[in-house]
Amino acid sequence: MGKIILTGDRPTGKLHLGHYVGSLRRRVELQNLGDYDKMFVFMADVQALTDNADNPEKIRQNIIEVALDYLSAGLSPEKCTLYIQSQIPEIAELTTFLMNLVSVSRVQRNPTVKTEIKMRNFEANIPMGFFAYPVSQAADIAAFKATTVPAGEDQEPMLELTRELVRRFNQIYAPVLVEPAIMLPENATARRLPGTDGKEKMSKSLGNCIYLSDDADTVWKNVKTMYTDPTHLNVSDPGHVEGNTVFTYLDTFSTDEDFAEFWPEFQNLDELKAAYTAGGIGDMKCKKLLNSVLNKMLDPIRARRHEYEQDIPEIYNILKKGSLEARETAAQTMDEVRAAMQINYFEDTDLIQSQAERFRQK
């Protein structure tokens, strides 16, 4: 069995820095390392529709936005398979079969489901598709026999449910499906980058995002208003770096080379932190450094995006080709699933012959 990695995003909006450090940057690294036999990256439009059923146009428009973000960030259709979830009907079929192997109470115990139901005010009227999406996620993974799923800690309950369903299927029918392992982000900051306002999560709905496609002026506008240390009222005052969003971002994005280029007075971030803590460093100077660091990183991403935007039909061709390739893989898995469940009636020649013999002997 080969090493297969699978990951994706809900296409409900353009991708931001939180997506980039949480998963996208790591995906590009994994793709380029070449340690995996196959890499699948998909846009989960079916899942996005579970809480956007009345607004399919939102999903339709954002498919291309996410695809552009994928490609401009460095994902290559030559090295990974990019596809759209809804174009793989085998996933829906496998979801139906897996639903028979899990109880409603088991899905209800998933803490991520509980949190998202509350966040969307679904307590009194939960759409069935939304409630059952963890089973659909399990099918997403199992259909491609993924061995590794990069995800945040909040997705561990989903991965555990996937493993349970895979084990139960294999025990009841045949050892066809593969139990996946989670790959967590390498550091705590990458697991959840705070919003520019200091809130725990960067979110479009909170208006605290910096998007990968934002121009330099927009980036500066967001950095300039970024939450810092509310007690650091004067430049001479000692500052606090803990909980200071500017320093959280510098921890995540800056390098020693950035200091040599943009603030040679300091050799690295540790030296700047020490000086800021001692007093004498203004917040605006730190924000200007962060702005330079972010734009240096985003410049090539924006340039690639501009190039891809000149040929949108080709982007759809890439997604179509990837979806066809992904469907071939999922279809092969489903052939094995149906055979294991003994519902491959027309391919089971032994069944046909035995039934014919039984009726001949009547």
PLM region spans:
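A broad detector of the eukaryotic-type serine/threonine protein kinase catalytic domain
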Residues: R10, Q47-A48, F144-V149, G207, ...
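A short secondary-structure junction signal
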Residues: R109-T112, A146, A174, S205
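Structured ligand/cofactor/substrate-binding pocket environments in proteins
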Residues: L15-L24, M39-F40, D45, N55-I59, ...
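Pocket-edge structural micro-motifs
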Residues: T7-D9, I84, K145, G195, ...
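Extreme N-terminus of proteins, especially the signal/transit-peptide cleavage junction
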Residues: M1-K3, F346-E347
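Conserved nucleotide- and phosphate/pyrophosphate-binding catalytic cores
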Residues: R163-K362
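N-terminal Rossmann-like or analogous alpha/beta NTP/dinucleotide-binding catalytic cores
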Residues: G2-A139, K296, H306
